[in-house]
Structure formats: structure tokens, C-alpha cells
Amino acid sequence: MDTEMDTCITVWHWPTHERWYDEGIRHSLDLIREAGFTHINWNPDSGSSYMLADAEIEFTRRIVAEAGLQTHSVHASNGVNPVSELAHAGPVPFAQETRKNFLSHHDWQRQSGVELLKNRIDLAAALGAPNVVLHVDITDDTFRSVENENLLFEPLFRSFDDVEAHCIERNVQIAVETLVKANAENYLKLYARLFSRYSSDFVGVCYDSGHWELIEPGKLSVLERHGDRLIATHIHDNFGAKDDHLLPFDGRLDWDAITKAIAATNYRTPLNFETPMDRYVLSESSYYQRAHAIALRLEEMVASARDRAAN
């Protein structure tokens, strides 16, 4: 097994640590590197409207560099996922910060969401990450009528138009994630609309393996249809019923088929494991060591599939 291969895992924040935002994350970064990982996906604050100050962005860049890690991706915030450190003190309505929404029809609110997205793009640029992963929320009602489509795409296109130059100037792409609130056909329609309007140096796909298994069990049409736009991955496993976010091979996903499908694209490895350690009873260091062995296994599967295709 080639232990020198690039590997990537998501770094999370664990609010049980009094200073999770610096000492806690720094400790996790050190353990991730000690386990053998070379890259991270930066996830803290991905579910909140928290705006990072310039000093925080620089601090984040520094602690990742000091840990000897590179950043493969940053999870951006769409502003409407009601998670913030305020809510941990006891959820109350005013603590649910969901006002910065780049899909809002209230233009002040949409513009606020654009500012939040630009903030995460700036973080990615500082970290040297090539993309930010973004949730674009759709449902199965989105494509039932032209009116419903316009309700989504009018603010979506305005917001993406507003951030396009910001992204291109910083060499940061937006990777739109495969989610679970609509069927596979409708996510393919979403990507088709986006890719007919925006170039590949701006917008691509984040393939979330667990999410896609839930909406299209045993199939990989998003990779087959839009593999040329694959720029980010969220790799995790489940049993087909819940979004478990397990390590690969701990659920039912067909990793041979998945790695072959990814290998057939121009995706730049490493794969990113989006697998929080709270699914396991292991210590943090033991968890990362186990995850790294599995990450190496998947990287070798992708590399082998590419070698076979080339020969």
C-alpha cells in the first residue's frame, strides 16, 4: 500500500471544547496530519451565517499551514442552515441565524447571502483551496412548473452572476453539492441549467456519495452525465435509509463502481472523506488512523482504475 498518496478528510468543530474555534481545531489538525492525511476539507461554520473577520481568515490559514496540511475544499454556507454557536447555548428563535440567503426574493437578504458566500470564497483563496462547496436547495416541486423554476433560478442566477468575477479573480470554483430533498432527475436538471449558463472554471459538481445513494440507489448518473464538471467530493457510506456519513465499507455503497466512475472523470484527487468521528466510539486519534487506512484503499482503487483504462 502506497502510504505517500494524497488523502483528504473533513475537519469539523466540536463545541464540547471550550475554545473549539482555535485550540480545539488546532488539536484536530495535528491528529489528522499524524494519521497520515495530506489534505483537509474545511467545514467549521459551514452551517451558519457567521462572517469571518480578516484576522480569523489569516489565523485559519496559519494553523492549517503549521499542521503541514493543504486544503482541498472549503464548505461554504448558504445562510439558511440553522446552525450557529449561538444556538448551542439554548435554541431560541433569534439564535437561528438564517437571514443571509442568496436565494431570497428580498434583494437585501439575497445580497447579504452573496456577501456571506464571498466571505467563504475569500477563506478558500487564503487557504489555497480550489473550490467552495455550496448547497443549492431544491425540492421535487421546483421543476413542476415554469413559475416554480423561476422562483429558484431568478435569485440563483443573480447571485451567481454577482460572485462570478469574485471567484475567477481568486481561482476558486463553486461546487454545487448533490443533496437529498429532490429526486435524482431534478438534480440533473439543476446541473444542466447551471452548466448551460456558467463555464467550468466557475461552477462544477460536488458528488456526495451518501446523498446520491439515497436519491438514486445503486446508480451513478450524476457522474455519468456530468463527470466532466466533477471538482469536489464528499465521500461517505450509509445503508440506504439515512444520511449516516459512515466511513466507506461500513455501509452498503458499491465502492468498486464508485471509484471506477470517478476514475473515468478528470477529477483531481484526493477524495474527500466527509465522515464525522461522532458516528464512532473511537478516540479522535484512533478514528483518524482508521479513516486514513480506508482513504488509502480508495485512492489506490481510483489510481488502479485509471491505470487499467490507460493501458
Swiss-Prot record:
Domain of life according to the entry: Bacteria
Classification via Pfam families: AP_endonuc_2
Disulfide bonds: none
Presence of keyword Transport: no
The entry's keywords: Plasmid
Gene3D superfamilies from the UniProt entry: Divalent-metal-dependent TIM barrel enzymes
KW Nucleus (keyword) present: no
PANTHER family hit by this protein: HYDROXYPYRUVATE ISOMERASE
Name used for this protein in its record: Uncharacterized protein y4fM
The species this protein was found in: Sinorhizobium fredii (strain NBRC 101917 / NGR234)
Organism classification: Bacteria, Pseudomonadati, Pseudomonadota, Alphaproteobacteria, Hyphomicrobiales
